[in-house]
Amino acid sequence: MAELPIAPVDRLIRKAGAQRVSEKAAKLLAEHLEEKALEIARKAVDLAKHAGRKTVKVEDIKLAIRS
């Protein structure tokens, strides 16, 4: 189950042009977004560790997104 709140995901879908959004659709997108965010975060943590740091910096996130 996704930890991301459903309301912001609902707003994103509406911003994309939907007039109505089912709860199941918003939950499914929230789960997918959370999985993608965790994937990026894990890569960023690995990059920070590789650089000898404990702190994840914006550069780590940018590089993780590009890879």
From Swiss-Prot:
Binds and compact DNA (95 to 150 base pairs) to form nucleosome-like structures that contain positive DNA supercoils. Increases the resistance of DNA to thermal denaturation. This is Archaeal histone B. One of its GO terms (molecular function) is protein heterodimerization activity. The keyword DNA-binding applies. The keyword DNA-binding applies. Pfam families: CBFD_NFYB_HMF. GO terms for cellular component: chromosome; cytoplasm. Homodimer or heterodimer with another histone. Dimers then assemble into higher oligomers, with the DNA wrapped around the protein core. It comes from the Archaea. It comes from Pyrococcus horikoshii (strain ATCC 700860 / DSM 12428 / JCM 9974 / NBRC 100139 / OT-3). Keywords: Chromosome, Cytoplasm, DNA-binding. PANTHER family: ARCHAEAL HISTONE A. Belongs to the archaeal histone HMF family.
